[in-house]
């Protein structure tokens, strides 16, 4: 069911500074900022040879990233994202196995324009997991 690692998401207090660090210090290919109002974030994707890094910064009132940064002012790893071929089948199988899907349980369109779901971190060793349909 689980596919390749799509990205590791890192919440950052200063999006421009974080992007510059990846671009200038590490020599990475850094994309342009994208506002994702449905998710309350602005994101920048960093392309690596084998996966991506997603930099997350709060967007708007009630952003879940704002709460994360309040607890972790320097930022930190927010979630990991795995690819799945059929997000509804994956959701149903995970729920049957006892995993909790966050929100309404229905996929939303993510930053790549594909359906995504999030799984409760308490069900995955403290790690928030995102599933993205490929």
Curated annotation (Swiss-Prot):
Highest taxon of the lineage: Bacteria
Disulfide pairings: none
Cofactor binding: number and manner: Can use Co(2+) or Mn(2+) as cofactor, but Mg(2+) and Ni(2+) cannot support enzymatic activity.
InterPro entries recorded: Glyas_Bleomycin-R_OHBP_Dase, MeMalonyl-CoA_epimerase, MMCE/EMCE_epimerase, VOC
SUPFAM superfamilies: Glyoxalase/Bleomycin resistance protein/Dihydroxybiphenyl dioxygenase (SSF54593)
Catalysed reactions listed for this entry: (2R)-ethylmalonyl-CoA = (2S)-ethylmalonyl-CoA; (R)-methylmalonyl-CoA = (S)-methylmalonyl-CoA
GO BP terms, alphabetized: L-methylmalonyl-CoA metabolic process
Enzyme class (EC, first level): isomerase
PROSITE patterns: VOC
Name of this protein: Ethylmalonyl-CoA/methylmalonyl-CoA epimerase
Gene: epi
């Amino acid at each position: 069911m689980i596919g390749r690692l799509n990205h590791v998401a890192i919440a950052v207090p200063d999006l421009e500074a974080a992007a510059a660090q990846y671009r200038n210090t590490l020599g990475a290919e850094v994309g342009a900022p994208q506002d994702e109002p449905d998710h309350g974030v602005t994101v920048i994707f960093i392309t690596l040879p084998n996966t991506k890094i997603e930099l997350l910064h709060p967007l708007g009132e009630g952003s879940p990233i704002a709460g994360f940064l309040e607890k972790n002012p320097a930022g930190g790893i927010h979630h990991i994202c795995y690819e799945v071929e059929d997000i509804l089948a994956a959701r149903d199988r995970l729920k049957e196995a006892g995993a909790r899907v966050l929100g309404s349980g229905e996929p939303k369109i993510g930053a790549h324009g594909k359906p995504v779901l999030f799984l409760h971190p308490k069900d995955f060793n403290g790690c928030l997991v995102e599933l993205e349909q490929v």
